[in-house]
Amino acid sequence: MRIAHVLTSVLILSFCLQTQNLFAQDSVNTSAILDRSAIIRSQRFLDNQDWDWFVENIPFLDCPDEDIQTTYYYRWELITKHLTYGNPDTGYLFTEFIDRPFWSGAYGAISCPAGHQLYEARWLRSGEIAKDYSRYWVNTPGAQPRNYSTWLADAVLAVDAVHPDPEQLGGLLDGLIANYEGWRNRHFDASVGLFWQTGHDDGMEFNIASRQTQDILRGAPSYRPSFNAYMWADAKAIAKIASKQGRVEIEKQFNEFADKLRTTMLAKLWDPKRKFFFPMFKNNENRDGYEISAGTLVYQDGRFAGDNHGRELIGYVPWQFSMFEPKSPYEEAWAKLMDTDGFFADYGPTTVERNDPMFLLQ
């Protein structure tokens, strides 16, 4: 899908979500502008054909681009495939895998996609599901919120922006702080000023850094732009929630920490030569006789030292959370998105540049 189509879909979706309540009637089968029942029934490929559920619960989109429209409703079907119910105390939650593998937490949830799931579920007409899932990660024994990277506090605040619930938001604050401190105690390197994470636990099992180490699946703990962006976003979210609750000292502490984290990330993970954000190795690494020094960015050392590639899509994650002002010098990174020597591909961007020496179809 071309980037223009993607941008168009974002604009249309934004309009749809902002205006759904203006145009919708209470009837399950009709609306003043859109025949919701007819639209959803036209998506005949959906496995879930509980048409009434879609009509009652999701915001509707009608646009002339069939690919965008089909993708939009397919994403809502995925929500239904992974929606489950724990018990009366936990309420609704989402799985990552339908078969609930052994590494999942209570009732099958896994923290890796939790930020995405909360971002999507917040647009349901009722806030019940997204608010239940927010509580799940904070209150449920066995939820395992720190098994994988995620932007939990930021996502919880995003849910509240659509379905305001000051009482619930305030009740989750201490748990969100405890979760953040859990990450900080285990993954923050005060000597560097950044959080470290492995690609595997950052939701990227195959990555350039780990494939240059002895452990290609779980190796190469690094100061990754993705994980540090998540932790910056969570710190800012906790500060905002604390502000809403009148907890001024917590607000101040987390804002100050976020500011320092951002400054350090820009100074250490941005490569002005390659104009992109890269992971920085935490430890000395070696593979096949090639040594990589701790504190170097991907391809600054080792077998491919000096190569002009090494970019991965995680270098764009900081923009998800608006870490920079518009027209910042870091926007040069976006030149690679539509570059055929970079990430451009016919069916969506590749995770590694296509002409990278370590490009791999996996």
Stretch-by-stretch model annotation:
Residues 8-18:
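Bacterial N-terminal signal peptides
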Residues 19-24:
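Boundary at the C-terminal end of the N-terminal hydrophobic targeting segment
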Residues 29, 33-37, 42-46, 50-55, ...:
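Catalytic cores of carbohydrate-active enzymes
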